[in-house]
């Protein structure tokens, strides 16, 4: 996963005053998943990522990658 996503989730979790345990419980995912998400694991289930992001009013979506990635 993109490191900026990991940092975003960690920052939002702290802003909301959640521990990793709190976030896992509120999002309905495992603690291990939250840890892996915040550590930038490269392969994560998008549905679970969206469960976490939904707590903060966000979801994973397609965005422009930048000029170097254009067809």
What are these model-predicted stretches?
Residues 7-22, 26, 51:
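Short basic helix-loop element that most often maps to the first helix and adjoining turn
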């Amino acid at each position: 996963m993109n490191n900026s996503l990991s940092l975003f989730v960690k920052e939002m979790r702290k802003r909301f005053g959640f521990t990793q345990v709190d976030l896992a419980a509120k999002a309905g995912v495992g603690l291990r998943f939250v840890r892996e998400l915040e550590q930038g694991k490269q392969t994560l289930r998008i549905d679970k990522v969206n469960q976490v992001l939904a707590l903060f009013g966000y979801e994973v979506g397609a965005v422009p990658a930048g000029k170097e990635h254009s067809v």
